[in-house]
Amino acid sequence: MSHYAPSRELVVEVCRTLLDRGYLKATEGNVSVRVPGEDVYAVTPSSYDYSRMEAGDICVLGFDGRRILGQKKASIEASMHAAVYELRADVNVIIHTHQPYASALALMERPIPALFDEQVRYLGRSVELVPYAPSGTGFLKKNVAKRIGGGANAFILENHGVLVLGGSAEQAVHNMALLEKVALDYLLALLIDGRAEKVPLPIREIAFQKLRKDEKELAHQATAARAAREAAEARAREAERV
């Protein structure tokens, strides 16, 4: 069995969870998982029904775009996923969906301010807008890359959908559910009163610093995993020469 199998299986597991919760529909959206210690990731194929997806359907690509495994065409957003992994060592799972409430804000071109401490703790100081660009283009990839450096884990893609990041599959799914909950609450507040108050600044900063601490620990773990893998490969090469 290929050592990429666990990552491919995890992509399918995440897709099924999101499908069951109504965050994914038919072939919309995409999901990817970083392969530990490598510049490689597993990503959903393009235009393939999630209800029929199996591990063998998942594409395995290098960050440079080279195909490693999989016969199907990779998601048109694959390069966007690769860019996130290259820029954020703490991110191990990426989810892009067109889920209804958060996507409604994408159509309104409205970011979500810091409404709840839990939101800031896991998603960041705010859910920022990523300027519109056509799906699957280098323009969208560049727009996303410009936004993710601040440590936030959720973004609204103008006139498109949402992008959520996580250090694990469980955290990414949690972040997606939290984003949809916050988006619904925000929409209701705007509908009823036309406004929504932010959580107090000191609380926001405490919550955000906890998030940043988690991200630094994840980045450190990723660096250690890469170093261990490179050392193992070096030992293997040395053994071959002996």
Predicted regions, residues:
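Glycine-rich flexible loops
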Residues: 1-242
